[in-house]
């Protein structure tokens, strides 16, 4: 009966691991031109991956986009009056920190209140900006607005 195979006895099959060919190391093993053929750009240097063989490249075929991105543009986070009513059914004083605490907007960004939906509770809202319809609806419900 033979011994069980042990992990340290395992060897790869003969010819399974061929040594890597080191090119340019003598005439017998891809010496001189090292498998690149003779002459031409590809024999002398590597062509960039973006080169399309003289065809007009993709980045030049595509049209230029007009305009620019305004770095000074302010992106407001919006919250509607209906969302405020759902989040604060008891009414009262509401600041941006309270709106953030309820998870309606993210912190550290300006907040604009829009007039989508209906409102019936008295809210005294402080935010960065308000739409005209939001101001009308909040004041019609007996509340007030303050731009901070």
UniProtKB/Swiss-Prot annotation:
Biased composition annotated in UniProt, kind: Basic and acidic residues: 1-12
Family: Belongs to the universal ribosomal protein uL15 family.
RNA-binding in keyword set: yes
Subunit structure: Part of the 50S ribosomal subunit.
GO annotation, cellular component aspect: cytosolic large ribosomal subunit
GO biological process: translation
Keyword vocabulary terms for this entry: Ribonucleoprotein, Ribosomal protein, RNA-binding, rRNA-binding
Coiled-coil zones: none
Function: Binds to the 23S rRNA.
Gene responsible for this protein: rplO
A molecular function GO annotation: structural constituent of ribosome
Official protein name in the record: Large ribosomal subunit protein uL15
Chain positions covered by the region annotation Disordered: 1-52
Keyword RNA-binding tagged: yes
């Amino acid at each position: 009966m033979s011994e069980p195979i042990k992990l340290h006895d395992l060897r790869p099959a003969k010819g399974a691991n061929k040594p890597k060919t080191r090119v340019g190391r003598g005439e017998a093993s891809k010496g001189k031109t090292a498998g690149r053929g003779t002459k031409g750009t590809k024999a002398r240097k590597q062509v960039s991956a973006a080169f399309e063989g003289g065809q007009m490249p993709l980045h030049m075929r595509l049209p230029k986009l007009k305009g620019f991105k305004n770095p000074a543009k302010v992106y407001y986070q919006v919250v509607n009056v209906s969302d405020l009513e759902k989040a604060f059914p008891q009414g009262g004083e509401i600041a941006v920190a309270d709106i953030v605490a309820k998870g309606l907007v993210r912190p550290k960004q300006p907040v604009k209140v829009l007039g989508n939906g209906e409102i019936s509770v008295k809210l005294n809202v402080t935010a960065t900006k308000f739409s005209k319809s939001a101001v009308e609806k909040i004041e019609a419900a007996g509340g007030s607005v303050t731009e901070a």
